[in-house]
Amino acid sequence: PFWHMMTCAAIVLTALSFILGRDIWKQKWQGRKGGTKYIVGQIVLGIALAFVLWGVFWVGDKLSQWVFPSFARMQVNSIYSIKDGFDPHVVGLLLLLLIGPAEEIFWRGYVQERLQRSCSKTWIGALIGIALYTAIHIPSCNFMLIVAAGVCGVVWGGLYWWKPQWFPALLLSHAVWDAAVFVWFPI
């Protein structure tokens, strides 16, 4: 089933990110000061960003239904059907505590960081990372999901490129947004 596959993928990709990116993670956390002000700021920023993104998607849903009346809703409903037959509490916890953080650790913390380090200009690495994050959703053949991944990729990837020290907030944002849009407040 889908949720078993996502759980396994999250665990494997997180482990690979830490194993293959030891140098990245060591450098990223070396000498970091994590005082209360920093931690509270990251939490507030992460939650606020998640709900701003939720609002963007709410508006996007209304616009897409206006532009593509039956197509958009059918595509969105097929995404939401993935949770059918599963306890929504379990799905929410998986998204919040494992899958969302794992995706951010892999895509921004490892893939995008590695690309930014290997390209002559960091913004080129960021764009490639965003494109890869979007492209990985193409096999779903779900246009709305691909667009959603592109929007989130631009936001999280762009912010990571601009302010890499916001990584904890981006990780929290991804986790909260996943649970909010998919379980707590479906659009």
What is the predicted role of each segment?
Residues S17, G21-R22, V56-G60, E103-E104, ...:
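Alpha-helical transmembrane segments of polytopic integral membrane proteins
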Residues I11-L13, L49-F57, C152, W177, ...:
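Alpha-helical transmembrane segments of multipass membrane proteins
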Residues D84-I187:
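Transmembrane helix-loop-helix hairpins at the membrane interface
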Residues K26-I99, R117:
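Juxtamembrane helix-loop-helix connectors linking adjacent transmembrane helices
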Residues P1-Q27:
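Alpha-helical transmembrane segments in multi-pass membrane proteins
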Residues G21-K26, K62-S70, I138-N142, Q165, ...:
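Transmembrane helix-loop junctions in multipass membrane proteins, especially transporters and channels
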Residues P1-M5, F68, V183-I187:
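Juxtamembrane/transmembrane-helix boundary motifs at the membrane-water interface
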Residues C8, K26, G46, C141, ...:
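Alpha-helical and His/Cys-centered functional microenvironments
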